[in-house]
Amino acid sequence: MQSCKDDDLILTGQPSWLGNSIYERLQDEGNYKYTLRLIDDLGEKDVLSHTGSRTLFVAADSAYEAWFKDNKWGVSQYEDLTLPQKKLLLRNSMIDNAYLLELMSNETAEGDAATPEWGRTMRRTTSASAYDSVYVMQPDEMPDNAYWASKRGGNAIRILKDVTEAPMIHFLPAYLQNHKITAEDLNLLTNHRATSINEAWVNGVKVVNSGDPDKKKIDYDVTCKNGYIQKVERVIESSPNMAQLVYQDDDMSTWAHLLDRYAVPYFDKTLWQDYNKNYKNNDSLFVLRYAAKSYYGGSGKVTIDRSNYDTSSDNGKYVYNDERTNQKTVIPYDELLRFDPGWNQYIDDNQQNTLHNDAGMMIVPTNQAVQEWWNGPGKSLQDEYGTLDNVPTPIVTELINVNMIPTFSTYVPSKFASVLNDAKEPLGITKNDIAQCYMGCNGVVYKVNKVFTPALFASVAYPALAHASTMNIIYSIIDGRTFKPYLLSMDSKYALILPSNNAMQLILDPASFGRSTTTDDVKTETPYILEFTFNKEKQQIECVRYKSTVDEMGEITKGEKLGEIGNTGSLLTFRNRLYDSMMNYLIIVLPDKDMTVEKYVKQGYKYFKTKGGGLIKVTDVGGKLQFQGGWQVEHNRNIPAVERYDMDNGSSYLVEDMVPTASQKSVYITLQEHPEFSKFLTMMENDYNNVLANTLSNKYTAGQSWVSSKNLRLLDNYNYTVYVPTNEAIEALQAEKILPTDEELDRGDFDTKTKNDPKVDSICIAEGWYPDGANETKKADIRAKVVETLTTIMSDFIRYHVQDHSVAIGMVPDVEVDENGNVTSYKNKTSFESMKRDLETGRFIPLEVNYTNNSMTVKDNTVKDANGNVIKAGVTHNVVTSNGLYNLQCREYWFEGKNTEVNASLFMASDVVVHQIDGVLLPGVKRPWRDIVKEALGIE
């Protein structure tokens, strides 16, 4: 028999439980006349009566009556609603698919449509169109910035608040649970209206009875034949984006005024033509954008990378094109917001996310909070600029960006401790700071009662940003070459040397060190000079190379222009490596956080180790600090600090004369210049030692090639100390036959191909190292072993006189700290690794160095037998200070692509300090070199 309940299915083609259409159900309910009027007026009756598949969120007539009495639109009755307002009310409340409430937070997994991902979705597009809310903006409403200048003097314009449709934002139980969002979080997000994570909230409005634990009063998931009805407690007005939310609250008007700086009227011809075609309107149509590093570019997300601003091309930069004047403006990278707060369908940087999965977040202080900050912690800005409007946009950008958080779900109030500032340290926001929350279509705005500032404002890098007119070149380098995060650390104490734009016009090109001319027996240095300037129109640093001359007092005279150094390919690499080398020489990390450079100098210290390992010499002349890099020391030239800026993590020093520059001399050149080093140089450079070279890997060339310099191949991209024994000390070892004599180190005429080596042959004969009856092949093998052993002896001798880490007399020492980080003592005595490796342990044999303001000693290795008995006690040697051969700074450069005089790119550099010592350093027990050779030959 057939059930009578199947009659509906037979007669209508639908089961009885499916119910009527959405439109009919609203009619039957009897208390949704306003929603029905909206449907009728917008021509949606047929869609919601018969066809389509929709989810409609509806508010009862009583909710509308309450809304007419209090709304932001100023509408007091239905008849006052404009057509765009009606579209916003209906279409923002409707989704073009049928969804059960509990399934709205699910998302179909990629690659397997049958396996939805639970609790992944918090936003969905609605039936709204971007054209539903075209706004007519009057000239006096336009933001007061340069991008609107051509329009403020004209007529009103039609503008979209965004070109992408505004999605619905919903907080549903599955999403809240999946992202560990607590009931207290939801309570704060809804301004204390929510009480349970079982509730469902859509655009800040609660779904009726959605939190009923017994589910006895269910007013959602009303099933209709063409979709679902979800009843909500209040009227869903629209889905404003975060930027609109800030502008809508008068108590955030100061912050909104700051956002005006970034507003850009973007004209899209295709969009305009489409609008005119559909709406029969010939007026130009603009889109309101906010200049940002992440924005919607017409076909998808666009991300601006800082490195794009290092190139000559405009590609990859944020370019505004005024359609009326056809003038292009490159908006500076440091004037771009973190993301566009007006992008309705904002997508974060998580590549696995779409607009559905997350949203953004803005922290916006009240007007009172801004005023209190301006008169308190921000007083230094007030003193500098007078009014907030006068504060340069790059500074304002840093302030706004630290309060723009790219993902919402990761940083809800219960996770505020994870909100980090630009130094990757806690921003400091707590739930108690929240005055009100706003849910937008692209994120949540937290209105707070205090201003959260970036770490940059307290860091040593800040003066360069704050004084852009005089230091924008060095700040661009700090920001562009990743030094800014390093300088933001509040756990370190810095001294940062900041060259002015004038100083940046006199940069010595290290690839040209060693160039000179001689006239009338007078030698004049002729290095190349790099002149850096900042092109405001292109928002990039430009560089020109010049010839120059340097007089005996270190004064540089700029000469003939050689050409520009561009921003592409190998030239960009050249510049970036030069920037890095320069910046590493301008940053000093002070070991004792309670000290300043001035205090150290007052205590007698003169040398400070830089971030890159080189040394800066600092003296006090008439109460002003004077800086000298290695080059300035060589040329007896001081660079005065003309301004000091005290910040939370150290002090910055403005220099205008020139940039402190590392030494131009290699170790080889330094040894050549002083006859007192001649014996050690012989030990370095002879027929048995190959530690010096002018090329590396057949690809890199040593610096100062014009004077045939060579580099110490033992060194890497680090800092070192070389101890040079006196000539007499080396001669004494030669006399003891511990080291070969100069004559023995000369192999004379030898041929590696034929293995003909008469000098070594004569030694082997004299010492009886050839066994009786040895043929020529055997003799050649013995000679090869002798050469190999002597090469090792000489290399090891040099290696034990070279240590990791530069150390100088008068250098600020490292410190010992307790468990709380408090300084307990200065580490004047330290053990450093030499370059000589212990073949048994594999470790580098140490040297013990003790250095003070006026002396230094070096103690060589103590050797013990297997039982722990000392068989060779360490010997302490003094650095000789009587002849001035100490604290000699050197720098060894390796250049890539040095085919001509102007295209060499710095590959790496080593910083070295050379000291003469009064004895020879021995890693082990003294052994005559002949005994070592005999052992290698197996001769007893």
Description of each model-found segment:
Residues 3-940:
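Mature, structured domains of secreted/extracytosolic soluble proteins
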